[in-house]
Amino acid sequence: MTYNEKIISMNNDLLDHQHKELFEISKKLSLMNQRHVGTKELKIVLRELLIMINRHFSDEEAFMREIGYPYINHHTRIHRKIILEIEEIIISEAKFVNIMTEKLNLVVQDFIFKHTAKEDSKIVKYYEEKFKK
């Protein structure tokens, strides 16, 4: 599966680029799970994931405020839930690297594909209705 087959455009170059970066991190996690990596290598990718996802959510929430998106509070709660889910996996599976990478990969892929298709598409629809008439 390629990035362009599944990810919608947010009409925002920064957010679109970040979605692509998160997709690349997801690919790294998937490969790490197949290769049975050590904790040192995993920590590097986990750090990259947490930094990128927090930055992306912050930027996306700023975009929603900028366009006056009426459901920003709901969307922000979903973001917090995703972050908590990732953190919970890291804590609960710290001793089992392969299980951790597998679970994280599923959460990240779910976020990238399902969240963008379902939730982010609502932002896109609102943006297009409000600004692209």
Swiss-Prot record:
Identify the Pfam families for this entry: Hemerythrin
Spell out the Gene3D superfamilies in the cross-references: Hemerythrin-like (1.20.120.50)
Keyword presence, Transport: yes
Which amino acid positions bind Fe cation 1, per UniProt? 19, 56, 60, 120
Q: Which UniProt keywords apply?
A: Iron, Metal-binding, Oxygen transport, Transport
Coiled-coil segments: none
Q: Does the keyword NADP apply?
A: no
- Which positions does UniProt annotate for Fe cation 2 binding? 60, 75, 79, 115, 120
Q: Which domain of life is it from?
A: Bacteria
Q: Which GO terms describe its molecular function?
A: iron ion binding; oxygen carrier activity
CDD domains per UniProt: Hemerythrin (cd12107)
InterPro entries the record matches = Bacteriohemerythrin-like, Haemerythrin_Fe_BS, Hemerythrin, Hemerythrin-like, Hemerythrin-like_sf, Hemerythrin_metal-bd
Quaternary structure, per UniProt, is: Monomer.
Family recorded in the similarity comment: Belongs to the hemerythrin family.
- Tell me, in a sentence or two, what this protein's role is: Oxygen-binding protein. May be involved in a storage mechanism or for delivery to oxygen-requiring enzymes. The oxygen-binding site contains two iron atoms.
Q: What is this protein called?
A: Bacteriohemerythrin
